[in-house]
From Swiss-Prot:
Organism the protein comes from: Vibrio vulnificus (strain CMCP6)
Pfam families noted in UniProt: Metallophos (PF00149)
PANTHER family, A to Z: CYTOCHROME C5 (PTHR40942:SF4), PTHR40942
Record has Hydrolase as a keyword: yes
Alphabetized InterPro entries for the sequence: ApaH, Calcineurin-like_PHP_ApaH, Metallo-depent_PP-like
Hydrolase keyword on record: yes
EC number: 3.6.1.41
Keywords: Hydrolase
Name of the molecule in the record: Bis(5'-nucleosyl)-tetraphosphatase, symmetrical
Similarity annotation: Belongs to the Ap4A hydrolase family.
MF terms in GO: bis(5'-nucleosyl)-tetraphosphatase (symmetrical) activity
Gene assigned in the entry: apaH
């Protein structure tokens, strides 16, 4: 009974299948944790959604920014990006069912020994706050008001957490922290623009969210995706799993029990 955590799949379904074969994943005994961005620029987003959904309780999924964007496109709120290969989802007979399933997924998933989210956990949150914030947005996404939330979630402000944030300001910050965050300024403000590796950042105030000196201590390690430029990052406190399969990099997965890392190079599409 092993736990496998995989980085951003982004529709790279064939690579996922090879990776699961490589580690001899058994859906009857093992659990696959997916760190968000199931869909987008890879060639088989539809197949990816179908497969992960078919795993039932053997899959634990968190939402990424591309998954939320897919919902916005499905509602006509946003246009499909030119490089996204998600059109087959909308044309499929089970497209609505898959989108409904996706909308039920959380922003934060928790194991007794670790937590999984797409981009990270705000450095100003402890784990209890992160749980509560995730649940606030999750309940809205699962409600009849989800269109209102998706329609209004696109905004980089506010960029600093305050406990008294309310309404859209609160929801926007929560969504940005869980699904879009990479760098923060020294005072904890989120930077929504820089996507570079930390070694290439010249702005002295910018630092990865997980290295902020005043970051609140968490009870468990955080496993996340989203940041391909990190090219994989492993420390005692955080594990970054996005290694840019969709950018001709690789799909990376870790087995929690022995920390063995599995990697599948991107196939030529």
């Amino acid at each position: 009974m092993a736990n496998y955590i995989v980085g951003d799949i982004q529709g790279c379904f064939d690579e996922l299948m090879l990776l699961l074969a490589q580690c001899q994943f058994d859906k009857n005994q093992d659990t696959l944790w997916v760190a968000g961005d199931l869909v987008a620029r890879g060639p088989k987003s539809l197949e990816t959604l179908r497969f992960i959904k078919s795993l039932g309780n053997s899959a634990k999924v968190v939402l990424g920014n591309h998954d939320l964007h897919l919902m916005a496109v499905s509602l006509g709120i946003r246009n499909n990006k030119a490089k996204d290969k998600t059109a087959p989802i909308f044309a499929s007979e089970d497209g609505n069912e898959l989108l409904h399933w996706l909308r039920q997924q959380p922003l934060l998933a928790e194991h007794p020994e670790f937590v999984v989210c797409h981009a990270g956990i705000s450095p100003q949150w402890d784990l209890a706050t992160a749980r509560l914030c995730a649940e606030e947005v999750e309940s809205l996404l699962r409600s009849e008001n989800y269109r209102w939330l998706i329609e209004n979630m696109y905004c980089n402000q506010p960029d600093l957490w305050q406990d008294n944030l309310s309404g859209l300001d609160r929801y926007r910050y929560i969504i940005n922290a869980f699904t879009r965050m990479r760098f923060c300024f020294a005072d904890g403000r989120l930077d929504m623009d820089c996507k570079l590796p930390p070694s290439e950042v010249k702005e002295s105030e910018l630092m990865p969210w997980f290295t902020l000196p005043q970051r609140r201590a968490l009870d468990k390690p955080v496993l996340f995706g989203h940041w391909a430029a990190l090219e994989g990052y492993i420390s005692e406190e955080v594990i970054g799993l996005d290694t840019g399969c969709v950018w001709n990099g690789s799909l990376t997965m870790i087995r929690w029990e022995d920390k063995q890392v599995f990697s599948q190079k991107a196939l030529e599409n």
